[in-house]
Amino acid sequence: MSETATWQPSASIPNLLKRAAIMTEIRRFFADRGVLEVETPCMSQATVTDIHLFPFETRFVGPGHSQGMNLYLMTSPEYHMKRLLVAGCGPVFQLCRSFRNEEMGRHHNPEFTMLEWYRPHYDMYRLMNEVDDLLQQVLECQPAESLSYQQVFQRHLEIDPLSADKTQLREAAAKLDLSNIADTEEDRDTLLQLLFTMGVEPHIGKEKPTFVYHFPASQASLAQISTEDHRVAERFEVYFKGIELANGFHELTDAREQQQRFEQDNRKRAARGLPQQPIDNNLLEALKVGMPDCSGVALGVDRLVMLALGAESLAEVIAFTVDRA
């Protein structure tokens, strides 16, 4: 297709037909397992507090809201789906549009398709097995391997991420020629993320998907802290062929702890000169009622389709990327 013909889809029609077949296959996977498909709002008055996520903001003006109501496009359907879990819906999944005001490139588009699902009474490992089942079915790949966050750092960077101090992390960064970034960074988790992205990700999941689990407790996000090792969180990510595919948690159910984490995020945002975000009080109220013990995962569908089709970029599997929207 001509580079100037921006009216045309970025993906070919044959690829869009294959994408549709994969979407059908995903829905069949969950229907066969008795998981309910749900739909939740794309906009909310609250948003994520994570310092690494940047939501789109808009303003609603209508009857009863002459002064306007701030709304955020959802970066993930997580909060609404957890409220459904509290309401008693049982296991649920959703295929939806999500939005992040961040980068655009081979593996990123500001608007993308998310597959998210929650399994009451599943621990992290059982959900990892189900993710593996889905990947094998859609990608026809080998069964995944599982490595702890500590193991991948020790294997590829020869440091222990759970005990290394910032000086040791900067020394590891220097070996990767990242001193220009690391030497001025004071946040330990940001240093760890830099090392993980540049020193670990390129080496894992080459032949088969790789689960990395037990991230540091300081990176728990909405996951529980392990009862066996308080240094780590019950959180995992999945990588295949250089691409992060999914991020999952043994979900935090304690409302007070969740509020403290939201508030801590906002303090970090303020320290970095970022806007503090409105906390989702509806989620906190739901957690106070009681969410069943569960695990959940979010998976990037566009990236999954890209891998299934052997494509080189998301543009080959999305009808219209943002520059053609």
From Swiss-Prot:
The UniProt record gives the binding positions of substrate as 76-78, 118, 251
For whether the record's keyword set contains Thylakoid, the answer is: no
Q: Which UniProt keywords apply?
A: ATP-binding, Ligase, Nucleotide-binding
KW ATP-binding (keyword) present: yes
Which residues are noted in the entry as ATP-binding? 100-102, 109, 244-245, 300
BP term (GO), one? lysyl-tRNA aminoacylation
| Cellular-component GO terms for this entry | cytosol
EC assignment: the record states 6.3.2.-
Under Gene Ontology molecular function, one entry of this record is:
tRNA binding
Q: Which reaction does it catalyse?
A: D-beta-lysine + L-lysyl-[protein] + ATP = N(6)-((3R)-3,6-diaminohexanoyl)-L-lysyl-[protein] + AMP + diphosphate + H(+)
> What is the top EC class of this enzyme, as a single word?
ligase
Purpose: With EpmB is involved in the beta-lysylation step of the post-translational modification of translation elongation factor P (EF-P). Catalyzes the ATP-dependent activation of (R)-beta-lysine produced by EpmB, forming a lysyl-adenylate, from which the beta-lysyl moiety is then transferred to the epsilon-amino group of a conserved specific lysine residue in EF-P.
Q: Which PANTHER family match?
A: ELONGATION FACTOR P--(R)-BETA-LYSINE LIGASE, LYSYL-TRNA SYNTHETASE
Subunit record text:
Homodimer.
State the similarity comment. Belongs to the class-II aminoacyl-tRNA synthetase family. EpmA subfamily.
Q: What is this protein called?
A: Elongation factor P--(R)-beta-lysine ligase
This chain's source organism reads Citrobacter koseri (strain ATCC BAA-895 / CDC 4225-83 / SGSC4696)
What is the name of the gene encoding this protein? epmA
